[in-house]
Each structure stands twice: as structure tokens, then as C-alpha cells.
Amino acid sequence: MKTYWNKGAKQKKKVIFFIIILLGLLFFLRDDYQPALLFVRKYIFIILVCFIMLFLGVRNFRKSASTGKRLGILFIVTLFFGALYFVCFHYHMYDYMKTYNVYNNLNRFEIVELPLTQNERIQPLRNIFSMANESVGETKDVSLPHLVRVDGSNQWTMAIQPTEKYVWQGIKDNTEEVFSVSSTTPFPRFSNENRIPVTFSIGESLKFSRNTYNAVVQRLNPWMLFNYEPSDTYYMKNDKGAWVQVVSLIKWKGFFFPYPSFGGVMVVDNGAHTFSDYLERVTIGKGTYISPEEMKNYEFLTKQNTLSEKVSRLQAESLKFLGGFSDPLPWNMKSAVKIPVAPKDQNAQPYVTDFDFSDTKIGAYSGLYHWFGLEPIGDERTSLSYSVFIPADGTNQLYYYDHASKKEGYAGVSAMPLKVKESKKEYDWSSNTPVEFRPYIKIIAGRKRMFFLGTVSTISNSNPEQFDGSATPDLALVDSEYRDVVWINAKKPSTWNEEIYKQLNEAWRSSEHINIYFEKENTVLEKNRQILDSIQLLSAQQKKVRDIQGLQRQIDSIKMDK
């Protein structure tokens, strides 16, 4: 390069022009090469070890004069890289160490009392997704629903955006509507009042600079390009009542076996596509970065669902190290746990659930959490080992309840589908299946009791991701302790606890010697009615006695005449 530079002015101009073009490409194409930067960041320790080993091997190879030594060096280098691959990737030791780093950096807190659930959602995520897609036209797609807090209530929100099937629409069209559907209603409606007209110039299905991922990456500074990556996109209202896109960010931490953590959010305001908007997107990107420490200053981001599920899953999975570093290894596994995967259930844990921590006295907020039900690591074991509660707003805290050490003997999520199917054998379970068993914790008959709430859905034979749930689905509550199944009315959530008690009170009373509950106090009118009925019954009985006595006298007189 130096020789070429010194040849003359023409060559210097070419070099300068080439450097300008290269810098321009590096600046404008940040979103294209950022995955490569993240790859280096995630595996930087392994890459450095490989580079050092390769450097030493090549240097010694060049210094060696004999063929035998060179063959020996080649053998050692090959053996090293082969062993590195098998240990780190084939046997997943790299992921093992990454998860252990997550565990060591977790702010864990064991709770001694389960929180109550509130604002139970009726429909599972995949049902909502299918019903939303049934409500849009050929040229529109619906983004994956997320449960968020909007105007003080829990809502399923998703964008109505140009379909990915037609590229031209993804280039020129905006995202112009958002679905916002109540999660607590048994019959969600996707009509006009739940279709919010709001325009975003970027979207998850749009192309090039108008894609949400690309626009957010362009907003990252050079340091963040190496350490942050966009994740899930949520739609909610900000503190001014305007609809915004909130993109959850993942931050990679650590040098030895880097691990993902919550990195804050990027908030993208609504607005139509304009030329100035285009210039902003391709140069500095879109969005306002809010760090985890600053999120407490924004009310709409507190007690909210903004945490990437990729991060929360790894945090929950890391609890397998509660028994020590070596406990999850194949020859131990005394307390190792896993996140269960239910067959045919497309929505894997976590289940975003609204919890009330007010009576636990641990200082945790009441609101949306990512809930996990961890089970023993063996496939044949389905007991509930831990309930894990991770604040959905990214608060640096993890709460867990240890069912196993308390020897409660609760059944886990994996055991629920078969129990529901066994309770109603007349169902066509070949096309229907109970899905998404989320926790239902209430005070019934004098103490907290844990159930799992499942919804029966019909899954398409041709497309396993297409769920068809009725507007008023069949719901089943399974007692995690007694294993009994209670079928409840989706339209009357206020009666669920009483329905549970009516079915299970005999078992509870015989086992726990509890008092009688749900006994209704009679009103004055009902008491007067009972008295009147008693008087009428007594009068009828007296009349019958007089009739019998009259008949007896007639019989006696007939006998005397004879």
C-alpha cells in the first residue's frame, strides 16, 4: 500500500477515494455487519484461544526443520481444535459456562410464600395470534402478540403491518394500525374499537432501513454495536398517551464466556415515512435509548413487559446451579432442573402473568412477571421443583419459590395435558389439545392453593402453528396438589373459586379437616319464605292426619256393623 501511495498523485486520489467509500460502507451498512460483530463479542474468548494456538502452531511449524516434528505439530493442533469443538459445542460446555455466569450474576431472592395471581388471561397467545390473522386482509400480517399494560389494564397488542409475501409493500407502505385487545375477556374482539389507527414508518416486516431491527441497530453507537442487540418489539402507550414501539435490548456482558442480560429499551415514536425520516433512518437510525437505570423515571415502562424472553429463559435455566457448579453434570443432577416443553404447545415458557405480591412482604411490585415452572431434568419426572418470578420490566431481581425442598409434591406443567385429557375422555383429543398451563394461585378454603389454568385449542393438521380457539373456550383448572381437574365457565371468572370448592371441598375437608366455606347467608325474604313453606308443609301434614283419622273411623264403624 505504501509503495502504491508513493507512485504519484493519481494513486493517492484512488487510495483516498477507496478509503472514503470503505468508511461510507462501514457507516451506512452497520445493520448488515453488526451480527458479525456480535458473533465476535459472544465468542471472543474462544476466538482468542484459537488464534493464540494457531499462531504458536504456525510459528513452531516454520521453525521445525524435520518432517517428524512438523507432523507432530500438525497432529497436536488438529487434536486441540477437535477437542475444543467437542467439549465446547458438541457437549455444550460453552453454554454450560455461559449459564453459570448468568447464575453468578443473578440477584436471586428465595420467597417463602407464593404471590396471588390477578387479572387472569383467558385466551392463550397462539389463539389470539390466529384470531388476529383471521381479521386482516391478504396484504397484511400481524406481529406476534405481547401482553402489556395499557391504560391500567392488561392488553394483547400487535401491529397490523404489510405482509412479508409482497416485497414492494414492505418497501413503500407504513405500519398503520395496532390491535389492542383485552386479555381478561373470554371473547376478544378484533373490530374497529380495538384497531387503533397509528402510523409507524418502521415495522418488523418492513424492508431495508424501514425494518425495526435495522433502524434500531443504526441508532447504536460504536461501543453498543459490539455489545447490544435488538430483541422483542412491544407496542404500548407512553406517558403522554401516544402509541410507541418499545424494542427490548440484550446486552452481552463478560469476557470469559459472555452472557446476555437486559440492556434497556429503544423507544420509537409513531410517525409517517418522509424524506427527512428516511435520512434519519439511514444515518443515525430511529429511537430513544433508555437504560435499565433510567427506566424507573418513565411510568409507562415500570411494572411493564419489556424484558426479552431470551434473557429471562436463561436466567430461569441458571437455577440448575443452586446445588453447586457440578450438580447439573451427568453424574450428579440431584437438584438440576429444566424448563419443560409441552408437546404441541407452540408458546413456550415463560408465561407472562399478573401477580399480586402485596401480602408477601418482600418489597416486590405487583404487576407483570415472566413465570417459569421448573421441573427435574429427567424426561420422566414431571413434579414442580421451582416457581420462578422474573420482573417483566427488567428490574434486576429474580424471585423463586422452592417447592421441592418443602416436599409439597406438586405436579408440574408437563403433567397437566394428560390429566385434562383423562378427565374428559369423550373429547376428540386427536385434533384438540390443552395448551399453555399458566399458574392460578388463590386463597380458597382458608389457605393459598396453586392450580394450573389451561385452554383447549384446536390445532390445524396442515399447519401446527395455527391454533383455532373459540370465542368462549373450554377452560380447565388443575389442582397441582390433589391432581383433580375442574372445568370452569370462561364467561364467569367471579365464580371460579366457588366452582373449585364445590368439586374439591370433600377431598379437602377429609384430608385437611377444614371448615365449611362458601355457605351463603339467607336474606330476610328467604327466611320468611322458609317459614311459610314450613307452615304450609305442616298444614298439609295435619290435613293428611285428619283424613287418615276419618278413614280409620269409617273402617271401625264398618267393622262394628258386621
Task: Label each residue range with its predicted role.
Residues 3-562:
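Soluble extracytoplasmic regions of secretory-pathway and membrane proteins
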